[in-house]
Amino acid sequence: MVSSTTPSSGEYLLEMSGINKSFPGVKALDNVNLKVRPHSIHALMGENGAGKSTLLKCLFGIYQKDSGTILFQGKEIDFHSAKEALENGISMVHQELNLVLQRSVMDNMWLRRYPTKGMFVDQDKMYRETKAIFDELDIDIDPRARVGTLSVSQMQMIEIAKAFSYNAKIVIMDEPTSSLTEKEVNHLFTIIRKLKERGCGIVYISHKMEEIFQLCDEVTVLRDGQWIATEPLAGLTMDKIIAMMVGRSLNQRFPDKENKPGEVILEVRNLTSLRQPSIRDVSFDLHKGEILGIAGLVGAKRTDIVETLFGIREKSAGTITLHGKQINNHNANEAINHGFALVTEERRSTGIYAYLDIGFNSLISNIRNYKNKVGLLDKSRMKSDTQWVIDSMRVKTPGHRTQIGSLSGGNQQKVIIGRWLLTQPEILMLDEPTRGIDVGAKFEIYQLIAELAKKGKGIIIISSEMPELLGITDRILVMSNGLVSGIVDTKTTTQNEILRLASLHL
């Protein structure tokens, strides 16, 4: 609810001051501040576990703060639900979109607040009002289209338009570009800037440092539940922000490339997948100890390559040769037996069993190998291997019985990589391995990948982050519309060259 506290000077739309929140045995927020001006885009940054989510849950009334004050447009607020916050002008666009896929766009826009004509929903008015908002924000989507037929970026636009329809003054955006193409990101940024022009205060959460400098005016950094700093972006460098986030200076974003790739271990020739639209005539070699990147725009069929190699997609033509011997992976089990491992793109939906413990998640890809002679599971060896995953992958956890869903994204990813290493692969394929992972944890993942390459593993990495590919790979295979448009040496190529190749067959 909104109290009648005396308004502040009006410099800020939102003032969260001295916010404290504790849970049993843990002080989650310790005197945290967040102040957002109108007509501004404010980055909220910190590693996973820094307190960003807890702070926002206190704002939305999901958690009740222990102490501190929250002022919105000069008046003290104390919301008890996200619905109450939304109705009072504070909205959030979540990373996991909150739309009903079976309903139309305009149904989603006005859900639970439909305009009516007598006893019936006024469909014409709903269409007109949706279209008017879309026109104002330059959103080209048919209000009558079913949401389930739209792209992720279009769904993001609907969420933003929905916030606009509530006349939101504060809009919080949580990793809004994680699944968007560069063109879609630019369109999203245009809409965000329109909201800024109209007087909104935008709180922008992202692990993509380049976006923060491209878009935001100010930044607030949290670390270990404490407020570290609020500063204008203009006076900061990327290294300074990283140092504030992690509490130390990161002298380098990527490990040194000390490894020299060896002989060819994998030869792929004219690989074509059966499912349409498909990859066509994909050819490349992978060397022992090499890190091969795969670049391309969304829709380039990068993931199709590793899924075909892993037996998830059926190939219709081409050959796969491992150590000079031609093989066929008809399914994932055959691929594992041939020494392939695949860390999938969607960590939470296809990579982990969030409500089960680290032990289960560490062993599930290799569980059949833990049966003893009488068919029972060897619990001692299972515990030992789980501990190996925790130790060798440097997983930060109280123990192997910890629910994996409670870990940070970086630690979840380490468990997944460790799980696959238990299968003793020669070829490790990673699809967007650092998506949604904070900057400190990213470096740890890069170190693990570099160490595995040094041990002779052949590694294939798909990434939408160009600095990541240029920073950790030896060569980059560029895809465009299902075709290989080039393979470049990372030492001599440029981002512009990769983007040119990625657009070659569009």
UniProtKB/Swiss-Prot annotation:
Biological function:
Part of the ABC transporter complex MglABC involved in galactose/methyl galactoside import. Responsible for energy coupling to the transport system.
Positions contributing to ATP binding: G46, E47, N48, G49, A50, G51, K52, S53
Please give the GO cellular component terms listed in this UniProt entry: plasma membrane
Q: What SUPFAM superfamilies has UniProt attached to this entry?
A: P-loop containing nucleoside triphosphate hydrolases (SSF52540)
Outline the extent of the ABC transporter domain.
Answer: 14-249, 264-506
Q: What is its EC number?
A: 7.5.2.11
The protein's matches in PANTHER family, at most eight in alphabetical order, are given as:
CARBOHYDRATE TRANSPORT ATP-BINDING PROTEIN MG119-RELATED (PTHR43790), GALACTOSE_METHYL GALACTOSIDE IMPORT ATP-BINDING PROTEIN MGLA (PTHR43790:SF7)
Q: Does the keyword Metal-binding apply?
A: no
Q: What is the lineage of its organism?
A: Bacteria, Pseudomonadati, Pseudomonadota, Gammaproteobacteria, Enterobacterales
**Organism of origin:** Shigella boydii serotype 4 (strain Sb227)
UniProt keyword list: ATP-binding, Cell inner membrane, Cell membrane, Membrane, Nucleotide-binding, Repeat, Sugar transport, Translocase, Transport
Please name the NCBIfam families in this protein's record.
PRK10982.1
Q: Which gene encodes it?
A: mglA
- The molecule here is called Galactose/methyl galactoside import ATP-binding protein MglA
**UniProt superkingdom:** Bacteria
Oligomer and partners: The complex is composed of one ATP-binding protein (MglA), two transmembrane proteins (MglC) and a solute-binding protein (MglB).
